[in-house]
Regions:
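ATP/Mg2+-dependent ligation/transfer catalytic cores
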Residues: 1-103
Length: 103
């Protein structure tokens, strides 16, 4: 059975970020947290990279079944650089690091 994954992330818009998404079709009944594959995208179209080196990485953080569509999941993601560092627009990662530092 095919399953639709809708990857969702915040772009690099200034002064306000916007939601972006792209769809991937995978084999399987359903996807749980930790099962959604890492996926790449062209960051130049989302204000997250220059045209000459525009590869960015979507790292899934949380997966939810889509309540509006059968055989579909919503995949909430962070944006990372290809060198496995958080992208500068990745404010969630900055928050996680701050919370760890405070504890």
């Amino acid at each position: 059975m095919k399953h639709k994954l809708e990857y969702i992330w915040l772009d690099g818009g200034e002064p306000t970020s916007h939601l972006r998404s792209k769809t991937k079709i995978v084999d399987g009944e359903g996807i749980e947290d930790g099962d959604a594959p890492i996926w790449g995208f062209d960051g130049s179209s989302t204000n997250q990279a220059e045209g000459h080196s525009s590869d960015c990485v979507l790292k899934p953080i949380r997966v939810y079944r889509n309540p509006l569509e059968a055989a579909s999941s919503l995949v909430l993601c962070e944006v990372w650089n290809v060198d496995d560092t958080p992208h500068e627009s990745n404010t969630r990662n900055k928050l996680v690091e701050t919370i760890r530092w405070i504890r």
